[in-house]
A protein has these predicted regions:
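Generic beta-strand structural signal
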Residues: 1-5, 31
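Short Pro-Gly-centered flexible turn/kink motifs
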Residues: 2-3, 156-174
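Beta-strand elements of well-folded, non-transmembrane domains
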Residues: 7-11, 147, 170-174
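A contiguous, surface-exposed recognition patch within enzymatic or periplasmic domains that forms
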Residues: 10-162
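Charged, amphipathic alpha-helical linkers/stalks
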Residues: 173-181
Length: 181
């Protein structure tokens, strides 16, 4: 699927912008979050907390379990709900892959424009998402990409009458064991 965006400021004042798109997908213990191999760090909203990626060696957001070598690329390992952004994204994709189903989703776009890549999860220990947000679908994760911003709420700006454009692609992937570069 191709998403082409046009952000236009038709006002007489400079204005902030924040664009993020979201793909939600079912997750279980076989699901892996894939950031490019050269991603060294993850960060939380506002770049307030950082962790090594994919193996964390520090408490993240005050959660001690993350400092014991937790592999944060696996959904099953997150002890709490969490949001992790790929810090300083240098490639044109992020992905998620269910190794049990041999299928996943890849989000792609020019990383100089689509600067942000992240995931949000309620985590495997939460029942809130399964009771409130779905009828019987089980746990899910949100893979997200941002244009002109690498974090939330890290705004970008549009000058008066300025136009910014971007193109992002969402791919279904199958039988490739994930993704890397």
């Amino acid at each position: 699927m191709e998403i082409s965006g046009r952000l236009i400021n038709s006002t007489p004042d400079d204005n902030s912008i924040l664009y993020w798109s979201n793909v939600s997908t079912h997750v279980d213990e076989n699901y892996q979050i894939i950031f490019p191999q050269n991603t060294e760090f993850g960060t939380f909203h506002c770049k307030e907390y950082f962790c090594h990626w994919p193996i964390t060696t520090e408490a993240f957001r005050g959660v001690e379990e993350y400092k014991h070598g937790l592999d944060a690329s696996w959904w099953k390992n997150h002890p709490v709900s969490n949001s992790i952004f790929a810090h300083n994204l240098k490639e044109d994709f992020i992905a998620g892959y269910d190794h049990g189903k041999n299928a996943g989703t890849m989000l792609a776009g020019n990383h100089h424009i689509s600067k942000g890549g992240k995931f949000w999860t309620w985590g495997p220990n939460s029942e809130w998402d399964t009771k409130i947000l779905t009828e019987n679908a089980g746990h899910y994760i949100e893979l997200m990409t941002g244009a002109y911003s690498d974090n939330q709420p890290d705004y970008s700006w549009l000058k008066t009458n300025e136009l910014k454009t971007f193109t992002q692609y969402y791919y279904g992937i199958r039988d490739i064991g994930g993704g890397k570069k």
